[in-house]
Amino acid sequence: MNKYRFIFLLLIPLTMAFSSYSCKIAVLKYNGGGDWYANPTSLNNLIQFCQANLNMNINPIYDVVDVESSELFRYPFIHMTGHGNVVFSISESENLRQYLKAGGFLHIDDNYGMDAFIRPEMKKVFPELDFIELPFTHPIYHQSYNFENGLPKIHEHDNQPARGYGLIYEGRLVCFYSYESDLGDGWEDPNVHKDSQNIRISALKMGANIIQYAFTN
């Protein structure tokens, strides 16, 4: 067992010891000027949905964690979003790499405009890996909720279908990248985007699948 995985496994139970919740999840804070803080109500709503429908015991208050922080290793699931620029330094890239190698999971949700920036930055994290489009048969689409056609389309931008990409390290999906879907918008409070209830539920179900997959794989 490498030292990073040891730290990861050690810190999660330590965090749980001070809480009645089984775990806590976090939003990734990054540099470069992009709005890492976008969709401020989305993760709270997703957590509430998971609690109510999948009986998950996640702390309802998510944290914000810096990409270079050792605190990263406290969280089994990290969510990342934004519309624009992302920059990882060498040390930030290495920290994120070690977190993912140690068993952590990163969900990147393109909030539109992120694609051109996140791909080269994740290449710093895993130079040896490329994002691959996951087939519709992948288990992430078939956890508690079945999505026979892959990611749901929440908001329209460039007349492109929603696509789910992954980084697979030593046989494990360590990063799931939802592109042209806008899942996070669908998780927000109903009055923010005024999406239909069906659209919101579809987004929340897919988000729940992602968390469930991350927790069990």
Residue ranges: model-predicted function:
Residues 8-17:
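Bacterial N-terminal signal peptides
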